[in-house]
Amino acid sequence: IYNPSDVEADLSQYSLQIKAYGKNHTAVNPPNDKVLIPLSGKLAPKASIICRHTKAELYTASGLTGELIYNGNDPIALIKGETVIDFLGNDPAKAWLTAEGKAAGEDVFLHRKVTIDAPSQTFVLDQWDATALTKDKQKETLTALITEHFGKR
C-alpha cells in the first residue's frame, strides 16, 4: 500500500477486500466469498507498506500482517468505508487468470509502476509489473525486488 498524499494516512479507516476463488477458479462459499481484512496503524506521506500473511515465510520484515489467504486468482480491493479506493485483479465476477488459464497473481511479485502515482478503482493491467518468482530462488528474488521497488517513489 502506498500513500501518495502529503499527509499521514490513518490505516484504521481502510480494509482489504479479497474475493476468494478456489483452486478450480470458482467462488468460494458464495455469497460469503469476500474476505474483509481491517487495517491498522499509520502510513507516513509518500511511504509504502507491505501486507503479508501472519505466517509468511519468504517475507518476514515489518509490515501489516493478517490472515491474507491468497492463491493468485483473487482480486483485491483497498476499501475506505464502502468505497473502492484501489483495485488489483480483474472484475470480481470471475477469477483472475492469464490467457493460459493460470492464476495471474500466483508465484509473481506484483507492483505498480513507479510512474503511476494515483490509485484506480478498476484494474488497469498496464499500471502493473509482474516478475516471476521461481521456486528455487523465491526468497532471494523477492528480497531483491522489494529492495529495488519499495521506497523509490
Q: Where are the language model's segments positioned?
A:
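Primarily marks secretory-pathway-exposed extracellular/lumenal segments that are disulfide-
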Residues: 142-153
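Acidic Ser/Thr/Pro-rich low-complexity disordered segments
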Residues: 22-34, 120-126
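Short acidic, flexible loop segments centered on an aromatic residue
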Residues: 6-26
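Asparagine-centered strand-capping/turn motif at beta-strand->loop junctions
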Residues: 1-5
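Solvent-exposed loop/turn segments at secondary-structure junctions
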Residues: 6, 23, 55-58, 117
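Secretome/extracellular-domain signature
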Residues: 26, 31-96
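Conserved beta-structured recognition patch
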Residues: 65-144
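Structured segments of extracytoplasmic/periplasmic soluble domains
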Residues: 19, 52, 113-116
